[in-house]
A protein has these predicted regions:
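Conserved hydrophobic/aromatic positions in well-ordered beta-strands
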Residues: 17, 149-153, 241
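N-terminal beta-alpha supersecondary unit
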Residues: 1-65
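Acyltransferase
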Residues: 209-256
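DPxDG-like acidic metal-binding loop motif
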Residues: 63-96
Length: 256
């Protein structure tokens, strides 16, 4: 039986999961301040105890590679590397945008928040029933102001469960003309913690928005694929995909 540890720390939500036999069997999450540094390792320890297994029983550790929060990604990758080093397990990295696409394809339950074509997570309506089959899924990670990290994925396959990335992952400043060429072709689902702020700017009948955080549970499908294909990272040299170079600034506040 395949067992995976999944770690997602790229946004304000810190989440971790254990998968066994292709099913999520344990899950933890927190959006509390500084949860990434204080809870990631705790979550993993709790879940291993809950399942009655040890790290040596797991086949690999999977972590979000970004883009996303510099601090969050650093904590997640450091934790994953530590687990892999300690137990001699392979490291799998899954892109944050790929996780959001998988999350959309899981048909997570969402409902209206009262504004046109905008949805937020709850227990009422399934995404495909709400918007029909989307032609494109456009995951968005918030990058402050009106900027997001994003890419466009085209949906293919008879069941609509095959997504192909057709643009490079890149930062984008959102305005009323953003993604116009894709909106003219069919329904587009904008999903992620950067999607909600775009709803007031991108006005189009084919534009649908789901404001949510990427979750460790949604990493399972791409993680299993990477495990089966033996697409592992070099534990010693792997670094997160920050996309933007992190720049440390000196506070202008007087220290004394």
């Amino acid at each position: 039986m395949q067992r995976l540890i999944l770690i997602e720390t790229s946004t304000a939500l810190c989440s971790a999961a254990i998968a066994e036999g292709g099913v999520i069997t344990s899950y933890r999450e927190s959006s509390a301040p500084k949860a990434h540094a204080s809870l990631t390792a705790v979550f993993i320890q709790e879940m291993l105890q809950e399942r009655g297994i040890s790290l040596s029983d797991c086949d690999a550790v999977c972590v979000s590679m970004g883009p996303g929060s510099y601090t969050g990604l650093r904590v997640g990758v450091s934790t994953a590397k530590g687990l892999c080093f300690g137990a001699g397990k392979p490291l799998i990295a899954v892109g944050t945008l790929d996780t959001l696409v998988a999350q959309a394809q899981m048909a997570d339950q969402v409902g209206h928040d009262g504004s046109t074509n905008t949805v937020i997570p709850d227990q009422n309506t399934v995404i495909p029933d709400l918007i029909g089959d989307p032609r494109f899924i456009i995951p968005m990670i918030d990058a402050r102001r009106m900027e997001v990290y994003s890419a466009v994925f085209e949906i293919a396959g008879q069941a609509g469960n095959d997504a192909r990335q057709i643009t490079e992952t890149a930062p984008a400043i959102i305005d009323e003309n953003s993604f116009a060429e894709y909106l003219e072709q069919g329904p587009c689902l904008f999903i992620g913690d950067g999607a909600g702020k775009c709803a007031d700017v991108i006005r189009h009948p084919n534009a649908h928005f789901c404001q949510c955080w990427p979750k460790a549970s949604a990493m399972l499908s791409p993680a299993i694929k990477a495990l089966n294909e033996k697409r592992f990272e070099d534990v010693a040299y792997f670094e997160p995909f920050y996309l933007k170079e992190f720049v440390a600034t000196v506070s202008k506040k007087k220290m004394w």
